[in-house]
């Protein structure tokens, strides 16, 4: 097209696989690459007008800002969930929520209680947003390297875990499968890495904290750490959870909750479905047809999990995916050349390693799926005391959700409802 003046400014050339089931030469090695069916590479020419929208309009900007504000609210609600089993937090929250100013003046005690409540919510809310920003920066840096434009992120609020992630769309066609792969995997890779670092650093702060500091940390049942194989192995290096009863409470630094939630959000986004990061990686490595088959199997697995004892998180996530991210993404301009001929095995290894990390996090020691936070205990629940006299493990009191906080406590069951224990 370069030989014709002005042609390259009006037309875009694509190299795409055309799948055929008959009349193919089986000796042609190129037609068996990366798919279950045979294909022939064909050139396709499109007008440059047939392209994704390359700039955000006012409506998109307003919608994106609204998503950001809503996500900020749900992250604060999730912060309330995370702290809901800490007696001190509940007492302060009740004081701040129930106080009525006399003569238009709020007491100093009430103001102090409100400040303490907010100070415990801020690390969780902004920690979650920070990890998501790191995830999105991974996409943007890779897109910049490959001269590809992507949209501003549209954040997905969640009442279960604060934030499900974000949606980023391609605003120009990726140049190749390699570009698609690098852009897609860079977000989850950065998100997994920083979430893991936050979890480990939070555990270090937990171990080194004084008893007074621990009293201000979120409390979760020790059995929570067995809800994920990967999480159990990491936490067991720092806390003596293997010697504690599952229903005893463990106090953890807020960064642990933030890191674990970040791992979950990145794992969900790396599922190989449609326009999710995992779906884009699958399409870059295996082609569109293979990616569609993998997505179908994954969707069936997600649907089955809805009827199991898995977290309701997966129900809300699959609904979002089906309505927003189910369809295949736009193709790269070169959709035939492998991800990288000389680095093909390394690219595949990175993809499988990330998928294995996702599976290790999502599968628990008991066969159920991972949950981010425990369900607030009811007044009839009797918790077993911890057997280990460590400061980070404490007997659980009977904690009931307060009426003023009940709308905010949207946690989901951990593994199963705790059985009453006679003490």
Where are these regions (language model features)?
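Hydrophobic transmembrane alpha-helices and their immediate loop junctions
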Residues: 1-423
């Amino acid at each position: 097209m370069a030989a014709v003046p002005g042609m390259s400014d009006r037309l875009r050339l694509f190299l795409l696989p055309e799948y055929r089931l008959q009349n193919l030469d089986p000796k042609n090695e190129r037609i068996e690459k990366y798919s279950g069916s045979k294909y022939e590479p064909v050139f396709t020419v499109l007008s440059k007008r047939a392209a994704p929208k390359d700039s955000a309009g006012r409506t998109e900007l307003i919608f994106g800002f609204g998503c950001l504000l809503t996500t900020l609210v749900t992250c604060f609600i999730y912060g309330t969930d995370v702290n809901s089993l800490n007696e001190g937090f509940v007492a302060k929250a009740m004081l701040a929520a129930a106080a009525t100013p006399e003569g238009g003046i709020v007491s100093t005690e009430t103001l102090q209680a409100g400040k303490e409540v907010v100070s415990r919510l801020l690390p969780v809310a902004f920690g979650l947003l920070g990890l998501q920003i790191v995830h999105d920066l991974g996409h943007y840096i890779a897109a910049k390297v490959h001269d590809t434009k992507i949209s501003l992120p549209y954040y997905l609020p969640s009442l279960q875990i604060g934030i499900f992630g974000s949606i980023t769309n391609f605003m120009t066609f990726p140049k190749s499968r390699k570009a698609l792969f690098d852009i897609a995997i860079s977000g989850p890779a950065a998100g997994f890495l920083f979430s893991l670092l936050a979890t480990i650093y939070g555990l270090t702060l937990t171990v080194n904290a004084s008893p007074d500091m621990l009293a201000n940390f979120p409390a979760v049942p020790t059995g929570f750490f067995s809800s994920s194989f990967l999480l159990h192995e990491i936490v067991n290096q720092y806390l003596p959870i293997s010697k504690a009863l599952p229903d005893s409470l463990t106090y953890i630094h807020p960064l642990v909750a933030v890191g674990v939630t970040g791992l979950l959000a990145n794992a969900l986004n790396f599922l190989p479905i449609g326009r999710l990061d995992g779906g884009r990686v699958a399409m870059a490595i295996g082609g569109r047809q293979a990616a569609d088959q993998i997505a179908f199997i994954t969707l069936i697995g997600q649907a089955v999990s809805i009827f199991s004892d898995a977290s309701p998180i997966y129900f809300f996530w699959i609904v979002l995916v089906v309505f927003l991210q189910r369809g295949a993404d736009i193709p790269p301009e070169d959709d035939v050349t492998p991800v990288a001929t000389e680095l093909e095995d390394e690219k595949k290894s990175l993809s499988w390693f990330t998928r294995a990390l996702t599976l290790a996090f999502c599968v628990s020691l008991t066969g159920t799926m991972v949950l981010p936070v425990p369900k607030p205990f009811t007044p009839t629940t009797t918790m077993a005391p911890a057997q280990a006299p460590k400061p980070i493990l404490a007997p659980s009191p009977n904690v009931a959700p307060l009426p003023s906080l009940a709308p905010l406590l949207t946690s989901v069951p951990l593994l199963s409802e705790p059985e009453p224990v006679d003490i």
